Amino acid sequence: MRMSPLAVVIGSLLILATIVFVVVLLPYVHTNQTTPSEIFRNRSAEEAVGRKLYIANGCVYCHSQSIRTIDWGLGAERIAQAGDYLADHPILLGSQRTGPDLSPAGGEHPDDWHVAHFTNPRYTRPLSLMPAFRFLGDKKMGYLIRHVQGLGMKAADRRMARQVEWKAKAIAAYEAGPDANVAWLNAQIPQGWRDVPNPYLTSEAGLARGHKIYQDFCLGCHGPVGDGMGPAQPFLNPPPLNFTILKNREISGGILYYQIMNGITGTAMPYFKRELEAEKIWEVGNYVAVNFINDSDADSEPKGIDAAYEP
């Protein structure tokens, strides 16, 4: 059988039509049947402008917006659902992460943390590879922050309401003076955590590890000498805590551990329980206690059974 030009054209058109049907029409029909998820809501006008800036400035190249079953990081308690993305055109799922996934990022930090972060990411995350976005100016940066704070939709709205509530309380405590501020911060910690014994020696090696952790995670806000005057400080309200005022204020290792682990919602202090395992939290707490507070309860009783590597 000879292949005529007409047969080639018709065959090619049939193949093209099949591809269009499978790749375009079938997914379109399927997505039209998708129902909104329990967290879905439409974007505000400011969030929509911020999303355009997010795309235009290449944020999607490094940040995905899809939590998968294999993920163990931020937001992994809830796996992404098709109904989360009904208003996304285009969808910004992403497949490779240089930075963290941002789909649940809304409300994880207060707005002022994001101002410092976008001005220079090293101010809040000293090891960050992210470029600075101070060139956007205050107005565009504000739109970008609104977009990020909306990621997570209704769940993000709940987190943002919590940030706003606790920020007002944290600012009031700070403005009441150092004594009232420290007392308020300590009052938010369960008694059991305040009294938990610090099992780790302040050894030379442990303090060196704590110093490295402090440089990698804490220096941008609390500063190199722990006085709260890191490069992020001018952008933050309330400002980072000055550790040097904590001497003789009954700051136990358990208090430091709890605050590092859980953070202080409403302030720029994030939680680190997903990034630092228990020993690293103890060691950076010991570093702060020894070098900035000059008061440590390390290696206190009851210690239980020492770990195998301990002297």
Regions found by a protein language model. Give the residues of each.
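Extended surface/linker regions that mediate inter-domain or inter-protein docking
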Residues: 1-31, 133-194, 199-202, 206, ...
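Electrostatic cytochrome c docking/interface patches
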Residues: 31-55, 67-72, 173-215, 301-311
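Surface-exposed patches in mature extracellular/periplasmic domains of secreted proteins
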Residues: 127-133, 155-162, 271-273, 295-301
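The canonical Cys-X-X-Cys-His
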Residues: 50, 56-65, 114, 130, ...
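Glycine-rich, acidic and aromatic/proline-enriched surface loops and short helix-turn segments
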Residues: 19-27, 120-123, 224-227, 262
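Conserved catalytic-core motifs of eukaryotic protein kinase domains, centered on the activation segment
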Residues: 231-233
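Short, non-ligating residues that shape and space the ligands of small metal-coordination modules
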Residues: 68-69, 227-228, 278
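Extracytoplasmic electron-transfer domains, predominantly the class I c-type cytochrome c fold
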Residues: 36-47, 72-149, 235-292
